[in-house]
Design a protein with these regions (language model features):
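Alpha-helical linker/hinge and terminal dimerization helices associated
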Residues: 7, 37, 43-44, 65-87
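Short helix-boundary/capping micro-motifs
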Residues: 11-28
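A late-sequence structural motif
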Residues: 104, 173, 235, 255-296
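Hydrophobic hinge/microswitch elements
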Residues: 128, 136, 208-255
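Flexible hinge/capping segments at coil-to-helix
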Residues: 156-193
Length: 296
């Protein structure tokens, strides 16, 4: 890698066309400018100037190095301008959350994206462990977690909580079913569904619930946005956080049946500790808070 100081001295020399003027601009001595030139030539193994009395011309190598020096200065100028301008509507935003919360959040992000062509938002649905790891290694700027991460390198804010819901077709009886009734319908399973069942169904049907591995499975859906679809068509039942129901386009064809023992999942917004948030991340944070507020 070229020595940045020597390159800057050489670029100034080329701009002024004179050793004395270059030394004055850089607040150096003329021998100091000559020394930087010699060191840069030694580093490259090429002569950069051809002397003609008190003046000089650039060699082919010198022309190339001068072009590099000017390009470096332009890059630095653009960098300084970017650092001084904290534009809410430009740059990259990387968010990770559960699939159900992503369904709720994405429609809230779309108007902002439409109004800000310079903005790139990456919203990733991920398991809790991946969200935590991604926040720590810098892959994600913001993450929505199901618990306070309690990590020294992260700071977290409690957003609220959302209920884990039993979801039936809209024409299901408006009463709490027994587990035998649910099993007769069959479970619409999904990646998180088995853990939800062991949590909510075991809590409410302790004598009848046989465990997730023994439930009658009617369907398995791996796309978070389509999990309620079979239930909306009268097929089976499922378990989802409230956000997964609110974001479903045909939620009028679903019935959420409150169970005697209710289960709530916490929502925490986490980011790297000590990192000042630029304007775009502050706005993304505010939109996440707004989305979480829909679940109250």
């Amino acid at each position: 890698m070229l020595n940045a100081t020597w390159l800057d001295t050489f670029t100034t020399l080329c701009e002024t066309g004179h050793f004395t003027r270059a030394a004055e601009r850089l607040n150096m001595t003329q021998p100091g400018v000559s020394q930087h030139l010699r060191k840069l030539e030694a580093q490259l193994g090429q002569s950069l100037i051809a002397r003609e009395g008190k003046s000089f011309t650039l060699t082919a190598a010198g022309e190339a190095v001068f072009a590099l020096g000017r390009a470096r200065r332009n890059e630095e100028k653009h960098l300084r301008a970017a650092l001084e301008t904290d534009d809410r509507d430009a740059g990259e935003v990387r968010i990770a959350c559960s699939g159900s919360f992503a369904m709720l959040l994405y429609p809230v992000l779309l108007p902002w994206m439409r109004a800000a062509p310079g903005l790139a938002i990456h919203l990733q649905a991920a398991p809790q462990a991946d969200i935590l790891a991604g926040l720590l290694d810098g892959r994600f700027d913001l993450g929505v977690l199901g618990a306070d991460p309690g990590h020294a390198r992260l700071e977290a804010r409690h957003l609220g909580r959302e209920e884990l819901c039993l979801v039936l077709p809209a024409d299901a009886p408006d009463r709490v079913p027994g587990f035998a009734d649910l099993d007769a319908r069959g479970f619409v399973a999904h990646p998180d569904g088995y853990a939800y069942a062991d949590d909510l169904l075991n809590l409410n049907f302790p004598g009848a619930y046989p465990g997730a591995d023994r439930m009658r499975i009617r369907a398995y859906v791996n796309q978070i946005g389509q999990i309620p679809a079979p239930v909306a068509e009268g097929i089976g039942y499922t378990l989802l956080p409230h956000s997964g129901i609110e974001a479903f386009a045909r939620k009028d064809r679903l019935r959420v049946v409150p169970l005697p023992q209710r289960r709530w999942h916490a929502l925490w917004l986490a980011a790297r500790r000590g990192r000042p948030l630029p304007a775009r991340l502050k706005h993304a944070r505010d939109l996440i808070v707004t989305s979480a507020g829909q679940l109250k």
